[in-house]
Amino acid sequence: MNKEYEYSFYVEEIEPFIQYCEKNNYRKIRECNQTRELYKNGNKILARVTKNYIDGNEKIFLDLKDENETEDTLKICRESGEIEVTNSMEFVNSLLEMMKFKFHKKLERKRYVYEKGNVKFEIDDYKVPKAKVVAIEGDKLEVDKVYSEIKNRNF
């Protein structure tokens, strides 16, 4: 189990953040369309079933995360690793039902992921619901430094 340290915030446009990553030698590790279904079980835990669509292929992943619906920019929460379940959806649905997870909502987005050292940018252009979100996560000291730099640039 990992403890995630993340700044997450809404933005007007994602392009300046993509340009920031590219100009500062962040490596693009993924660009894909995603759908994510969120499930809650009343214990402040979310189950997330994420479908990544890359080059016409679909891969499905399951992970768990502490529920954190605050408006705070900084979020610190526990997060499991993810497991690929592309060929195991019958099992996943059975597991969610047995653990009393109920469907909460579905998200659709295009996600860009950039990484450099211990810092990862997840830049999301949501189609449903309509929104643009940037998340910066990783090592506390490095993430704090990058977030401070971004904040001072007034993107």
Language-model regions, residue ranges each:
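N-terminal strand-loop-strand beta-hairpin
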Residues: 1-119, 153
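Short amphipathic alpha-helical surface patches that serve as generic macromolecular interface elements
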Residues: 89, 133, 144-147
